[in-house]
Every structure is written in structure tokens, then in C-alpha cells.
């Protein structure tokens, strides 16, 4: 890790990440400053402007907004046993009211998935930045174990693929 920066940035997990969660580099070479800035201006900034707009639009239209920030995670976890199928991250209650966290957990458990909360993924930038439960903006990060639906070494579908694909927010 680099010194003098935030822990995430210092370790290569800033706005333009240099490594994946296992510590392996994403790029074959160090990005030039202009390349990183171009990615921020062409991808990161427009995405976040659109997300902020959608949140405000939903607040105006419905009086509340639920943001589900969905990710996939590698299956192996040395710290967790048994390995969870799903990790729900609500920034330890700071990004989402407990009622929403409890509801989502019950829905996944009811469909036969094992669930953990906030460990090791409590929520990233989207969860922490946009979650305002006191203002009716509930944000939950959902991590889904890739091993449920794919062979992680060969990148091929597993028999469980269809069951995971059938998950729908409509059913939740």
C-alpha cells in the first residue's frame, strides 16, 4: 500500500481501482493520469450524476427510494465459515433502515440462500454516499457468490445458474 492516502486509495481500491479484491493487478501497466481522469469524466461522473438524478426523481414521485447496488463476489472466503451465498451490506445500519435490511434478508433466506450482513462487505461508495435512511433513501449493497451460478475457474455456467437467474426483485 502507498502512504499518505486514504486506506482504500493507498491499497489500489480508489475511484479507478488498480487491483481486484484478491490483490491481483487489473492493468498490465500503471495508468497515466490523463487515462484515469478520462475514465472518471466519461464513466464515473455521468453514472453518479444519473444515479443522483434517479434517486431525486423517485423521492419526488414516490416519497422514498430503494437503491440495490448488486455485485458478484468470489466464493472462497477463508474468514467465513460456512461460506454465505449472499452478503447484505448496509454500512452497519447507516445506509438503510433496519426494517429494509431485515426484509431483504428474510426474502433471500426464504428462497434457500445463506445470508450474512456487512462482513466482509459493509458497502462501498454508493452505499455510504447515497444512503440517507432518515431522508427515505435506503441503499443496500448485495454481494452474490459467483459459485452459485458459475464455475469460477472456467467461467462456465453451473446447474444452479437458472435458479439464480430466476431471482427477481419482483419476487423479493
Go through the PLM ranges and name each one:
Residues 1-29:
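Short, His- and charge-rich active-site/binding loops that engage polyanionic ligands
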Residues 143-167:
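A hydrophobic, small-residue-rich beta->alpha segment in the mid-to-C-terminal subdomain
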Residues 46-151:
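Catalytic cores of processing enzymes, dominated by hydrolases/peptidases
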Residues 40-43, 47-54, 164-168:
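Alpha-helical packing segments of well-folded alpha/beta enzyme cores
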